[in-house]
Amino acid sequence: MTKEIDINKLLAQENNALNTILSQVNELCEQNKQLQGLIEIQNETKALEKEYNRSLPWFKRFVNTVSNVKYIFIKSEEQLTNEAIKYNNKILKDIDNKIYNIAEKSVSLKQELQEEIEKNFKDLTKKDLSKDQRERLSEVFFSYKSKPERFSALHMTNPLQFINAEELEKQYNSLNATKQNIQNLISENSNVKELKEIQKQVAEIREEVPYTFFEKLNNIWQNVKNVFVNNSEQVLAKNKESNTRTIRKIDEQLYKTKHKFEELIENKERNINDIIAKLPDNEELQKIVSNLTNHMASTKEPILTNSSLAKPLENNITPPPPLPGNNIPSPPPPPPPLPGNNIPSPPPPPPPLPGNNIPSPPPPPPPLPGNNIPSPPPPPPPLSGNNIPSPPPPPPPLSGNNIPSPPPPPPPLPGNNIPSPPPPPPPLSQNNIPPPPPPPMAPVSAQTEKLSKPVEATTVKKPENQPRPSIDTSDLMREIAGPKKLRKVEETDVKVQDSRDLLLQSIRGEHKLKKVEFDPNTGKPVAHSHSKPVQNVNKLSGVASILARRVVMEMSDSSGSESDSGNWSDVGVNRNTKTLKTKRERRKILNNRNSQKPSFVK
């Protein structure tokens, strides 16, 4: 009773301010009288103005009238222009601010105001409004004008007063709207028992300093999301889509508010540090600094770290575990044999897998066997330079020399063979081409057939000796570890491929085969200068045959031998000197040859 008397006295003192608010409400109704329901509210406003007794029941009717004006503006917002909506919101904020200033002068009146606003809001949300309109209504109900004195007047020491209290006011209003959205979500899913218990906790949250308000609201929100996650979809199937949208929106609101608080706290921390730096140093100040540091460290921890933050109605999809079927071999030193892999593992030191083959750089790369196991595929014939063990007993040097040596032609080994003439042929051994006889094709083919048989036989027998390469694994790794040796292999392979192409062209040309000859001792091709004496001999033998024919023609001719012998002597001189004195004499000799050829044919 005493509280009501104090409230009535305060309202009587604020009679002029209340009349000003009533005139503003009447003006709003007059400017928007085309909206349905505002005429009745305008009549109610005039009735309130005529009453001179400003009591608590009158004040509650007055707050209810203002709430009804907000409800009509939200419901009929589509009928208004953007300019009209902005003007109406501006007037409503001014009205709310004036009502709040009056209620601030009495604690009991402020409490009555908050209870009446909350009651009116619950009654209005039960009316025919869409979900978006309800959210908009909650924003309008808690959209008081910025009041820096609200938070700057807190009982704190001077350095701790908030300078930018307008930002805190905005976060305070945003938290009120978020709280109302949570209450709406709970009321829409009232069939869940757990949510009914949480609804009481939301209603009991005190609107204190914005940051503590946020902490309490966020903790309750995590419990609400846990209820949605733990309940089956059959219970929430009715409002699943709307619940998902609302949950996402509330999460976004709390996320923005959290980061805004962090920004404000960091700015305030800088201000406090600047003030502390100007004060004289003593023990009490050091304690304050340490307490501030500990408090800021605990405050900067992420608040929205609950495990259910990203879970609401998202089917709780967990990240899939790593698939075990990767093609990358395991790195332990003794890996199991992988016979199916023809591609080496990507790490720089590849493990010695018996099935891995090092491909050579040519476009159709013939694989180099990694552990003396020849590859079976027929299209690319393997480089069998060291796949077949040589007669000497020690095998380790063979396993360590799987990569061909830098010289262009490979070393002579009995396992090398000449393949059939596809475009990418393997290198040719030095013992496969016979010495200089002109028709070399028959011996080459015969020797190729002889050499191909032992290669096939060793290819069949080699898998029996498969465990042997494990002894030479370290030697093989030392040979293939360095990237420089791999580059040398590419260069030597290109050179060998070029010599192979030249040799094949010589084989196909037949008459050019005598230009490429190999020394049986060194295995290197013989230089072209070695065949020049043969060409000179051929030239001399051709001249001798011509002279012999000329002698036969002269002896068979019935003409005088003296003139002919003179000519022959001239030719002999010319043959020795290899030059003619005049052009006329050369033409004369050529004419004599052409005229005497038919007699030789006869």
UniProtKB/Swiss-Prot annotation:
It is found in: Cell surface. The keyword Repeat applies. Residues 475-484 have a biased composition (Basic and acidic residues). Residues 307-484, 516-535, 555-602 are annotated as: Disordered. Signal peptide: none annotated. Residues 555-566 have a biased composition (Low complexity). Residues 578-590 have a biased composition (Basic residues). Residues 537-570 are annotated as: Central and acidic domains. Residues 472-489, 499-516 form the WH2 domain. Its main location: other. This is Arp2/3 complex-activating protein rickA. It comes from Rickettsia montanensis.
